[in-house]
Amino acid sequence: MEKPKLVYVIYIRTTLQKLWAAITKPQFTREYWGGLANVSDWKKGSPWQHVTEGKKPEIYITGQVLECIPPKHLVLTWADPDDSAEQSRVTFEIEAIEDMTCLTVTHGNFKAGSTMVRKVSWGWPRVLSSLKSFLETGKGLKVWAGR
């Protein structure tokens, strides 16, 4: 049986550089990703975390940077910190098209029977909608209500 792969494509009226910063800079990710920050030096082989900030940070997702070619290509492993054996892979591809960008997010390599598939298939549409709103209007969406 083939492992599931989730693919999301969204067009955003912004530049490659602004979209890249929105994905990789904690001061921006927290504005559209439910208050959570993506933290790393974004070098190949480095760890990354999706984390709350403050006195007692809570790690929601952890992984490793597999490939990083700013501002167009980023590949990460993705795992719940309590179950790193259930590791998947996320690829961000960014392409400039006239006065906008096309962002393709591919999330795959899920372990058979993974509960992560359900979680991320709920989360990615919300994250990407909020990201688009943030970059086009300066405000992320409150898509995490009722969570």
Regions found by a protein language model. Give the residues of each.
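Hydrophobic/aromatic beta-strand elements that line small-molecule binding cavities or substrate pockets
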Residues: 10, 61-66, 88-95
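Short, highly charged C-terminal tails/helix-capping segments
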Residues: 133-147
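A short, structured loop/turn motif at beta-sheet edges
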Residues: 16-17, 66-72, 93-102
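Glycine-rich portal/gate segments that line the openings of hydrophobic small-molecule binding cavities
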Residues: 39-79
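Hydrophobic pocket/interface hotspot
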Residues: 19-20, 29, 48, 65, ...
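Hydrophobic ligand-binding cavity/cleft-lining segments
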Residues: 1-39, 43
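Beta-strand/loop substructures that line and gate deep hydrophobic ligand-binding cavities in soluble
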Residues: 79-125, 131
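Intrinsic-disorder/low-complexity, polar/charged segments enriched in Ser/Thr/Lys/Arg/Asp/Glu/Gln
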Residues: 3-9, 47, 60, 73, ...
